[in-house]
């Protein structure tokens, strides 16, 4: 099961929200993020862990991750998650990390896709899509994503 493997990978990286899980061998954080982005129906709890990965591992292989995201048309998802991680870094006073994340966000901005999609649930109903379209953040709207994820939802993970 992709979700179980991903949860184990996130636990191995030290994600506090999954600290109760027995973790596997630690994987490359960039690979974990890409694996999650490629999952069509990603558990919301796992999607919420992704900004934490970017915030906690700002030295990951961004060149590889951005390239792989673009090849798979995932740059909007990565751009939005990078935006959320940057806003968390700013809130926490991690200015160097925020600056690095802003640079990655700017690089992703240049290849932003027009297509609207869900951050983690490709199987959303039309009613869910309408609700998210109305209630999403300006950042989610900018990245053409249907999600209500925001830094305020993630304080438990820090």
Where are these regions (language model features)?
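Charge-dense, extended regions
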Residues: 95-158
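Mid-protein regulatory/catalytic core that forms ligand/cofactor-binding pockets
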Residues: 16-110
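N-terminal leader/targeting peptides and immediately adjacent processing regions
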Residues: 1-27, 157
């Amino acid at each position: 099961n992709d979700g179980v493997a991903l949860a184990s990978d996130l636990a191995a990286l030290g994600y506090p929200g999954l600290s109760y899980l027995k973790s596997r061998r630690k994987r490359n954080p960039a690979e974990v993020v890409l694996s999650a982005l490629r999952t069509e129906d990603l558990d919301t709890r796992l999607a919420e862990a992704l900004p934490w990965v970017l915030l906690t591992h700002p030295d990951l292989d961004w060149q590889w991750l951005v390239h792989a995201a673009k090849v798979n048309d995932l740059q909007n998802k990565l751009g939005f998650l990078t935006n959320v991680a940057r806003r968390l870094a700013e809130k926490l006073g991690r200015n160097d990390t925020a600056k690095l994340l802003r640079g990655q966000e700017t690089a992703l901005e240049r290849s932003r896709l027009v297509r609207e999609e869900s951050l983690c649930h490709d199987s959303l109903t039309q009613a869910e899509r309408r609700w998210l379209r109305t209630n999403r953040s300006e950042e989610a709207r900018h990245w053409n994503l249907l999600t209500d994820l925001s830094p305020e939802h993630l304080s438990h993970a820090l």
